């Protein structure tokens, strides 16, 4: 660089070009497409047949086996009726995002300025998830025969939201012979609410949590300002000074209402401990 000496290299940004005001803009559209081709999951009939052949519905105690066989027949009726839920696609979407870049510059041989702004909106493949980023900057420079002033201001903003539909692995574990809604079209909170049959807890429907007022967001703001001055009263003497300011703030906001399925096992003395913030 122009200031390199004794093994020190100083990198400076490109100065705005002098002359008339110049404006430029670029934009693009982005797609986030889920790829499920690597997932080979069983359909409802295959899953039920695997459970039967593995002895899942067998029990040495006659009264237990009768109940299990009854449950098997209930599920088989659902399968024969055409129930075959492909859970992997339920929380997914094709995310459509966009990016924009704007630049403004101008000035004269003594005073030059430029301003830039970039906005990027990324829509995730999980429903209602996103990440939005804004970067802006203003560069100013002023030159005389003896003085040079430069100021660079940059601002970065970011906001992200996780999907209220939970995590994708929750849907991979769901049985295809379960239905997402009841006979009235309402999203189920639990599947087959048979506590004894499932051995301890109700299997929950992660789609139900998306109907609640859940929240999981984060954001941050970065601001940087660098000022430099160069004074050269004579050819053999140069005085340089720099001053910089940097600040960052960040926040997270996570809320789960008491009705969230993660608190389904909170009973008796823990009932009023449901919910988190």
Pin down the residues of each PLM region:
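An active-site-proximal structural segment forming one wall of the substrate-binding cleft
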Residues: 237
